[in-house]
């Protein structure tokens, strides 16, 4: 659903004299503010805008929300038309393409000028928005993959603690596979499956990101094991064919032993799975502690006519006060250290299991993978993923699929060189 809110500050000479220098210098200004599929927070945004206008009385802020399926095309159209919103909420790796194309403002000079701002945020998450040594976004909300496991199914299969290696993960999955039940399920979009390869020492690209590095005996072995486990029912085939609703629904159905997904899945699954409580659901790290982040952050369009004002506004949005309030209302983590500490303390009292899930998001944040800063990330996925599907679903031998993927990736990299 599209929502639009315009809040205007009054123009008054006496008030203008009391305004900060940045607002006086800009005169009457307008900022466009675009968010990604979060229209349910309209009340929060109105409150934040109202507070901002208390000290920036000549500023008008127009807020617009777009669904995730609509925002990228909308933003691209606005960029081409020269009417890009000044502040934009971007998810995943899509921001890299915009940064590389010169559409986003480099925030590094602002962070260097105000070093105390960077200290507000989790450094590992903040670093995920660096491209060629420059930082382009501030954190809005954060999430990374973890391993959920069905304690009841573990007990029925004679299993105790969660798996500690890839081979154990597959072995545990096989033990739980019986009838309609399967042992393991993973999300696959936005490289969320990549930790399964990383824990086996497989790299997608060379360190300089200029050559494919995945066509190795180790990668072939991983694919062969995944294909065998999928064919035998240990791994649920929805891992390779579903996207979001289908995998979450399958795990909520109480017939899957383990689910590799990010923290956002918890509340979706909990809403559907009556069986879910602290005695039946566990949350832990995947073996090797590798995880793929899928974050939202605020960027400033380079075409912004009032970048100083936009910077002040995103500082307000991501500062301790409003990040804490957002975390409380949405029951998530923001990447703002104090806000996340407060939210964990609050949710631990209301939902201990939810707190355990969120706690994993702040652990081992030095082990991110699948988040390469590539301007051609979408094209790379389009070339690579179909061959992974072919291998794990038994359509092609692993070595053939890897060779075909390698040729496709090489062509893409040559075009992008």
Description of each model-found segment:
Residues 5-25:
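N-terminal export signals
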Residues 108-121, 202-221, 271-276, 281-291, ...:
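Short, solvent-exposed loop/beta-turn-alpha elements that line the ligand-binding surface or hinge
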Residues 124, 278, 284, 328-383, ...:
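Long, aromatic- and glycine/proline-rich binding clefts that accommodate carbohydrate-like moieties
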Residues 47, 51-121, 152-164, 249-258, ...:
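Extracytoplasmic "Venus flytrap"/periplasmic binding protein-like
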Residues 173-175, 211-240:
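Glycine-centered hinge/linker elements that transmit conformational signals in sensory
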Residues 95-103, 108, 112, 123-161, ...:
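Periplasmic solute-binding protein
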Residues 92-144, 170, 218, 278-283, ...:
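Hinge/lid segment of periplasmic solute-binding proteins
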Residues 27, 50, 54-55, 155-157, ...:
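Extracytoplasmic/periplasmic substrate-recognition and gating elements
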């Amino acid at each position: 659903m599209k929502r639009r809110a315009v809040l205007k500050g009054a123009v008054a000479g006496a008030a203008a004299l009391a305004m900060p220098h940045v607002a006086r210098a800009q005169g009457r200004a307008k900022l466009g503010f675009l968010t990604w599929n979060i229209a349910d927070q309209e009340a929060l945004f109105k409150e934040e805008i109202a507070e901002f206008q208390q000290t920036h009385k000549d500023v008008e802020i127009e807020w617009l929300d777009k669904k995730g399926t609509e925002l990228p095309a909308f933003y691209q159209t606005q960029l081409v038309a020269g009417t890009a919103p000044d502040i934009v909420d971007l998810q995943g790796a899509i921001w890299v393409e915009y940064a590389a194309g010169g559409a986003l403002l480099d925030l590094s000079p602002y962070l260097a000028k105000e070093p105390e701002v960077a200290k507000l945020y989790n450094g590992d998450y903040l670093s995920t928005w660096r491209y060629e040594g420059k930082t382009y976004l501030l954190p809005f909300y954060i999430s990374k993959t973890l391993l959920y496991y069905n304690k009841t199914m573990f007990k029925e299969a004679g299993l105790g603690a969660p798996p500690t290696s890839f081979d154990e993960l597959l072995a545990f999955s096989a033990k739980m596979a019986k009838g309609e039940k399967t042992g393991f399920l993973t999300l696959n979009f936005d490289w969320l499956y990549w930790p399964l390869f990383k824990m086996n020492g497989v790299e997608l690209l060379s360190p300089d990101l200029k050559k494919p590095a995945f066509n190795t005996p180790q990668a072939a072995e991983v694919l062969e094991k995944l294909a065998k486990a999928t064919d035998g029912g240990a791994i649920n085939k929805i891992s390779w064919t579903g996207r979001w609703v289908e995998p979450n629904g399958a795990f909520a159905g109480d017939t899957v032993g383990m689910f590799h997904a990010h923290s956002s899945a918890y509340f979706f699954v909990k809403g559907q799975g009556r069986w879910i409580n602290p005695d039946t659901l566990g949350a832990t790290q995947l073996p090797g502690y590798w995880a793929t982040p899928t974050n939202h952050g605020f960027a400033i369009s380079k075409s912004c006519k009032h970048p100083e004002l936009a910077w002040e506004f995103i500082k307000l949005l991501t500062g301790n006060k409003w990040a804490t309030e957002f975390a409380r209302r949405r029951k998530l983590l923001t990447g703002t250290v104090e806000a996340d500490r407060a939210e964990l303390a609050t949710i631990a009292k209301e939902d201990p299991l939810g707190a355990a899930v969120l706690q994993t998001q702040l652990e081992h944040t030095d082990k991110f993978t699948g988040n390469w800063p590539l301007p051609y990330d979408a094209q790379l996925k389009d070339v690579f993923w179909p061959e992974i599907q072919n291998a794990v679903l038994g359509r092609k031998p692993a070595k053939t699929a890897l060779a075909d993927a390698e040729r496709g990736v090489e062509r893409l990299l040559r075009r992008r060189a």
